Regions:
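Short intrinsically disordered, low-complexity coil segments enriched in acidic
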Residues: 1-4, 164
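Proteins with a high burden of low-complexity, intrinsically disordered sequence enriched in S/T/G/P/A and R
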Residues: 3-4, 8, 26-28
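Leucine-biased recognition of intrinsically disordered, low-complexity hydrophobic segments
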Residues: 2, 11-12, 22
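Intrinsically disordered, low-complexity sequence elements enriched in Ser/Thr/Gly/Pro
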Residues: 2-3, 17, 52, 95
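Conserved short alpha-helical segments that host acidic/polar catalytic motifs at enzyme active sites
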Residues: 24-218
Length: 218
């Protein structure tokens, strides 16, 4: 059941009751997202560096800058910085992630963010989707292919599958997907077709919303 839902201009934020699964263990992934007037990648990289103390094995960012572009690497934030230094990063909306491996070994493919099948959606996720295997089998039967071993990639494919089947908005597709997944999570979703919108939700995993003057942070 949705406990609280906020729409603040171009940010949709949902909070679900913190009823944790019996075998729940906190996962120490880091999430940073930004929309506003500053260069998003600078804000996100700075935020990820402040989360390094939590421990992680890979890192990545997604930016909307002419397309929905994902940059990710195994290793430290400093390695990601070197990887993106020659990229065109001009964007005022984006999200970043530091990963602590659960499903799938530490490598570039398993790092977040993850694309949907059409690459029109991207997601970052902290937590564990306990029923991801059954969801994945359902999607495989529909012809989906996956590049990683993660539950997170299954999650974003599932969201897009719902959006296509129901012909609904991205925020409604996320809401419907969250009624089907089992586990604890904090997520942020971006959509190529909604270039000024960040969608976030949490259940059991922490996620903090910051509101500035004409800008928003997670």
């Amino acid at each position: 059941v949705l406990e609280r839902r906020y729409q603040i201009k171009n940010l949709l934020f949902a909070v679900y009751p913190d009823r944790k699964p019996l075998n729940y263990q906190p996962i120490m992934c880091g999430i940073v997202a930004y929309v506003g007037h500053r260069q998003a990648h600078e804000v996100i990289i700075k935020g990820l560096k402040r989360l390094e103390y939590r421990g992680y094995d890979s890192t990545g960012i997604a930016l909307l800058n002419g397309g929905l572009n994902v940059y990710k690497k195994k290793g430290k934030v400093s390695e990601l910085e070197r990887f993106i230094k020659d990229q065109k990063l001009d964007s005022h909306i984006g999200m970043g992630h530091t990963r602590w491996a659960t499903h799938g070994e530490p490598n570039d493919e398993n790092a977040h963010p993850h694309y949907s099948a059409t690459k029109k959606l991207a997601i970052i996720h902290n937590g564990i989707i306990e029923n991801y295997s059954s969801l994945k089998q359902e999607l495989l039967r529909k012809g989906h292919t996956f590049l990683s071993e993660t539950d997170t990639e299954v999650f974003v494919h599932f969201i897009e599958d719902i959006q296509q089947n129901e012909q609904c908005s991205i925020d409604e597709a996320v809401r419907l997907a969250l009624t089907k997944v089992v586990g604890a999570y904090a997520i942020v979703v971006m959509s190529l077709n909604d270039p000024d919108l960040l969608i976030a939700a949490r259940k059991g995993s922490p996620l903090v919303l910051g509101v500035g003057r004409g800008e928003f942070f997670m």
